[in-house]
Amino acid sequence: MDCPVLSIDVSKSQSHAAAFLSPGKSYQRPTPFPHTMEGMTSLVNCLVELEQITGKKPQVVLEATGNYSTPIVRFFQKANYQVVVLNPLETHQQKKKAIRKVKTDPVDAIRIAQVYYQNHPAPSAP
């Protein structure tokens, strides 16, 4: 599955997003964004750029974090993007495989994309 991906590490007040053209091919390094209309619109702009470059509609991938991830999932589904919600246990397994144990939101955004490309999970139902 070589589709473009916007991976998001969701946190309480702000989250981090990284964009990939395909597995291992980064388009945008992990950057923070606020949970505001302006912050979300900047991510939609990134998704539009990904689609223009690749000719494929990107998917949004994030970890299930309950109250924090639900509004983000709804936002992207309303914008007609497929959203893949990963089980946190899946991404935790990826962290355990890493040689260096690093817990930072930017690195987590990359790991979320890695789990997506390795496991090919199906998009969540709207």
State where each predicted segment sits.
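Phosphate- and other anionic-substrate recognition elements at nucleic-acid/protein interfaces
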Residues: 1-126
